Amino acid sequence: MSLPFYQRSHQHYDLSYRNKDLRTTMSHYQQEKKRSAVYTHGSTAYSSRSLAARRQESEAFSQASATSYQQQASQTYSLGASSSSRHSQGSEVSRKTASAYDYGYSHGLTDSSLLLEDYSSKLSPQTKRAKRSLLSGEETGSLPGNYLVPIYSGRQVHISGIRDSEEERIKEAAAYIAQKTLLASEEAIAASKQSTASKQSATSKRTTSTLQREETFEKKSRNIAIREKAEELSLKKTLEETQTYHGKLNEDHLLHAPEFIIKPRSHTVWEKENVKLHCSVAGWPEPRLTWYKNQVPINVHANPGKYIIESRYGMHTLEISKCDFEDTAQYRASAMNVQGELSAYASVVVKRYKGELDESLLRGGVSMPLSFAVTPYGYASKFEIHFDDKFDVSFGREGETMSLGCRVVITPEIKHFQPEVQWYRNGAPVSPSKWVQPHWSGDRATLTFSHLNKEDEGLYTIRVRMGEYYEQYSAYVFVRDADAEIEGAPAAPLDVVSLDANKDYIIISWKQPAVDGGSPILGYFIDKCEVGTDTWSQCNDTPVKFARFPVTGLIEGRSYIFRVRAVNKTGIGLPSRVSEPVAALDPAEKARLKSHPSAPWTGQIIVTEEEPTEGVIPGPPTDLSVTEATRSYVVLSWKPPGQRGHEGIMYFVEKCDVGAENWQRVNTELPVKSPRFALFDLVEGKSYRFRVRCSNSAGVGEPSETTEVTVVGDKLDIPKAPGKIIPSRNTDTSVVVSWEESRDAKELVGYYIEASVVGSGKWEPCNNNPVKGSRFTCHGLTTAQSYIFRVRAVNAAGLSEYSQDSEAIEVKAAIGGGVSPDVWPQLSDTPGGLTDSRGGMNGASPPTSQKDALLGSNPNKPSPPSSPSSRGQKEVSTVSESVQEPLSSPPQEAAPEEEQSQSEPPKKKKDPVAVPSAPYDITCLESFRDSMVLGWKQPDTTGGAEITGYYVNYREVVGEVPGKWREANIKAVSDAAYKISNLKENTLYQFQVSAMNIAGLGAPSTVSECFKCEEWTIAVPGPPHSVKLSEVRKNSLVLQWKPPVYSGRTPVTGYFVDLKEASAKDDQWRGLNEAAIVNKYLRVQGLKEGTSYVFRVRAVNQAGVGKPSDLAGPVVAETRPGTKEVVVSVDDDGVISLNFECDQMTPKSEFVWSKDYVPTEDSPRLEVENKGDKTKMTFKDLGTDDLGTYSCDVTDTDGIASSYLIDEEEMKRLLALSQEHKFPTVPTKSELAVEILEKGQVRFWMQAEKLSSNAKVSYIFNEKEIFEGPKYKMHIDRNTGIIEMFMEKLQDEDEGTYTFQIQDGKATGHSTLVLIGDVYKKLQKEAEFQRQEWIRKQGPHFAEYLSWEVTGECNVLLKCKVANIKKETHIVWYKDEREISVDEKHDFKDGICTLLITEFSKKDAGFYEVILKDDRGKDKSRLKLVDEAFQDLMTEVCKKIALSATDLKIQSTAEGIRLYSFVCYYLDDLKVNWSHNGTGIKYTDRVKSGVTGEQIWLQINEPTPNDKGKYVMELFDGKTGHQKTVDLSGQAFDEAFAEFQRLKQAAIAEKNRARVLGGLPDVVTIQEGKALNLTCNVWGDPPPEVSWLKNEKPLTSDDHCSLKFEAGKTAFFTISGVSTADSGKYGLVVKNKYGSETSDFTVSVFIPEEELRKGAMEPPKGNQKSK
């Protein structure tokens, strides 16, 4: 015997098999199954021989008490149906009597229903479905043999119960027994005759055909002989069992007292929730069950709607609606019949929140949109929704305001009945915020952006719903970058979010901007701001290129906001939009703060305290790994140790270079509080290993295991460039661009598209928010203009290279008007699960009757037979009663709907609950000789309501020709599997499955492949089924399945899971587990994000691996936006809980918690609390029994689920955290520290997070408490939490350990500072120095000591800054202890005193000193300018001189070409080097270098073409070389060389021209009568010609004046006797071919004085004559 599959997992009417109380019953069943092997093969003979008797019995029984029989038969139907199919597999006799068997079975008379009554009663505690009996007047021959009567009972039976009094039931039982006793002998006779004379029977055509086949194969063989012997033995056993059966036909054996198969269980629920109590009772006659509350019978009519009592299929249910505090009571289920009474008890505890709920909301109800209510015209009111003045594709700029809106026209217009208006962006609902505000004015819907950001870019959809009708409209919004403050600076990043927040660090992520400002982005700066302040501080000193960065140095418990700025070579761009505030908290603490109370208010809380253990050094951390590595930082993650004591622990991180064993502590000053740490300042490309140590007050623990070798560098590669850019026309202003996505791209954020007018060379971004997918519509283009496009991908590592430019396309409208908004990338799914509205308005009226709901939607279902004459066909009736209550519909609406259907087809409407979609992937799970077990996958769409069942149809396929469809089940089956019986062996069948919910029956599935009905005898197991995917993330998912129905010859021992990419070939399957796993689930890790996968499961037993299951998938490995995970939290009372939140729940969604993927319903160790879209599962006493994976599934959603693993280490961590919360400590912002004040005072201080007014502090020094006095001053600021202690001076006896102990109510805390050894001496020295400094500053003193500075004129300026001076203060400068300057009348500004030294050189080396003095004291500052200090100064001077050098210039001379540069002045310390074409110049007579004044030159005499090239003058200041370059080639050389030739020729001419070398005086004074001899040397080549001039007239040689020229060099001028007539101006003119020169001289002849006197004394002759 084998329990049918549909009974093992049926939920619709057989929930009892899922109860733990039936495990014992099932084990008995397995034992009986083994013991009844012989009976299995022999029972069919008895069955075939007892058909006639059974028919007579059923006729009599039908006349006597048909109703009683139906109830009794319904209890044995389930097992009977299975037994009848099993009994027929063992012998030829069953085949010979198949016709009679089918005839009897069709009338509700199976062998197991009358045979071995004790088996059916103890093996099947479920209620049995009734079989229809033969009417008394019907003849055997008049009934068709192949017709199967539908098995169902009337609706009244299920609703009102079967009996009204115990007496009637006893009478019916007695009548039934009497009929059996009367027909017992006839049955035995009929069985004997049937076995001997079956060939002569003519009861049906099928029996005749069977006998004819037996006669055909009359020839016996060894097999036939053995089979006949087995039949004979089976017949003997049947006769014995018949005698046993007759012995049981008495009233005493049939009657038995009530027995609870399933007892009601106690429940603890929240107020306003519903609760159901279930129980199942067995007994004969059937017991009557009564429910009691606190021993008072429950009256359903006295409290209408409060209690619902149901009894269906033996399962009794009490439902209490909207529990309140008064429903807390003890409930009793009392079952009674004539044999006795039995009771079962269960308690219901209703709990309420204390101060959590607003009672007014509970009384008044929740405010809902008016459109959800019934309209004045009823549900059938039709609304036409139109959009006028619609918003178009919009363009905005960052910082601007924008408003989207349209006018909504709804007809008919109904007062006080407003539509529901919802806005969506990229498919997600838009919630009101400070950035965006929706508004509805009564006829116009608007969406206003107060400050546009690039995050606001996307496809916006407005959806208006009125009643059950809706309409929607979509358009895209583009946001351009704001104008940069610095021209050429990059645009602002976007989407700044926090990825991983912890106690002291937060990882920030952002998206790179599309515009880089014209130069590549060098990196990003991250700024933080504490919430409540306006101060922004920069988090990183150097720009980071990776779009993720861990921000450290945060204060635990405080909230921060972040922004990001991009930087390129031009400057820093505008900041991004600030992120949402995020708190620096431990994730568990954050989840605790967000969660609801761990338990409802019960009125009393008892707290017990335990002494914590001390002195436990923590163990090593575990699971240390590198979670993220870039060139800028490396993030480590680990798990806390299991051994940690009962106090908080902190961590020290150590690093080590690969190849060395020298471990260095990274965080030497401050230990880490959270189990994560970010390391900076690592050398890129270098390999490291890391480890972590734990520490507490007891000491530092052992190190963890080291990580694998980590090479510092970006692990995430920049994506490759996209390819195949294809533009296509759309509208007059837009173009659709498609591309081939980047290959092997990891963590892809999206794509940026750019457009350029052909020939312009200027690219403009088409989108400022990365889009996913491979298609985008670029708007805002110029009509009739030609454009080209390019695309690049972006991920956290950066932006890819640009793709190749697309082909040019002219912007014009495409034929057909372009593409609809549905083709936008990642936006093709209608927003928020909205129905596509391209077909106009949507809506659907509810079905008007139950028949329409269940049958009218299935066109493939055959119509029911209209009369008994149609029963000749072997068809199953289509009448179904799965839905007990018809769906109501207003009767007044029938006529209008009918009129509408006649006049015009009704518009498509959207019903809140639709029929489900079709199931798919039908497969055969197990096959027998005459039955098969099918499995299928649930529909993708449930229609908004839970699926209540499935209907299966099948048809034969003979010679590839399918037959007619037949129904396999009348009652809907709730499981996704069903066993179909009464099939033909070795026949092919096809199947269809339809799903049903409260809205009706959905469309049938596609026709399955052909399955052959045959006995499976293979040794390996069959395929697993119901493979389900859940918890899909970007790199992991969870796979679940059910074991195969057919386990093979040996039990299943494990499973293998395979996967492959969806697009891969079948030969690329790879296994995920090397060894078989026992669990029926597996978490698959290591998936590639964005890749589509399919999975399959194979079962294995001792014989081998079985057939694979149907494929699960394909599924894309991605983490959907908004995905939330299960988080663990520990509240202040130490209560540990798992929390989950889902913002995508529907009204019918429920949270289902599981442990190791087995539901945890009513677990005594757990308590589940659901409130709205949040759920919490609390551990009552976390222990080793609670280890496992806890998952939470949300029903009626798109597979939303999450899980959390609690292993031994996590359990220890949570228990330690719970202990810490039970015994809290005072949190500190800063530990005890010491600082030196201005006068040398010492301040000890620490800061607590928060102190109450009752906080007390004890000050401990060397384990002794100290108090306020002359030496110590204490102060506590309870508002800021600062605790201080002051000491005037540190003495030697103050060395030791200082401790501040805090007591604040229950919480305690302390902080210790150790000041001993070198640390104390250094602190003491610093205090004394500060004291002396304070004394010094009481008089005139130096605020800044003497220093030097080199000015732009290369002078040296000695300067210092003085303070506290007055007019009487003297300032004296000294050099080498000699006074050089006194400044008595100082009027300098800002207290700056200077001494200027011009043309500084070695002579200025020495010691400089400045002294300040007045009546208050004096101070001095000394500057050493010798040796290295002087050399450093000279280096700076030389550097300034070198920087003052002018550019090299070219000058031509008569000797050659000179290159020169001027400096402010020259020092010998400045080294000058010249090079020619990169080679140093060797100085010769032809090439020389030198310095003349401030000119540094290089002289090239007689230049040649080899002197062409690049000349470099390098001025070396002692540390750095400064170069000046000139190119002496080409035209520059030609011009310089030509000038040199000219100057050279001019020099030659100047040298060889005729000239007077000397000898001639300027003036010759001579006495008259004397001889004048002048000699003059002349020169010229060739020798010059000589001529003389007198008074500018030529003078010729004569006797008086002799002119001679000898040897071409000497000219002689002689006057023999000079007279006054010879006075005058003379000139010597020399001349040759190169030129001439004139030398002038003057000859003055004078008369002696004596002759003048004589002449004066003599009278004039003229006068004498005149006398």
Curated annotation (Swiss-Prot):
Bias category Low complexity: which stretches? 192-210, 885-894
* Annotated region described as Disordered, given as residue ranges: 192-217, 818-915
Record-linked SUPFAM superfamilies:
Fibronectin type III, Immunoglobulin
User: InterPro entries recorded for this chain?
Assistant: FN3_dom, FN3_sf, Ig-like_dom, Ig-like_dom_sf, Ig-like_fold, Ig_I-set, Ig_sub, Ig_sub2
Please state the protein's primary subcellular location: cytoplasm
Q: Where in the cell is it found?
A: Cytoplasm, Myofibril, Sarcomere, M line
Q: Name one GO molecular function term.
A: structural constituent of cytoskeleton
What does the record say about tissue specificity?
A: Ubiquitously expressed in all striated muscles. Expressed in all fiber types.
Q: Which UniProt keywords apply?
A: Cytoplasm, Immunoglobulin domain, Muscle protein, Phosphoprotein, Repeat, Thick filament
What does this protein's UniProt record list under function? Answer: May link the intermediate filament cytoskeleton to the M-disk of the myofibrils in striated muscle. May also contact myosin filaments. Also binds beta-integrins.
**Name under which the protein is recorded:** Myomesin-1
Organism expressing this protein natively: Mus musculus (Mouse)
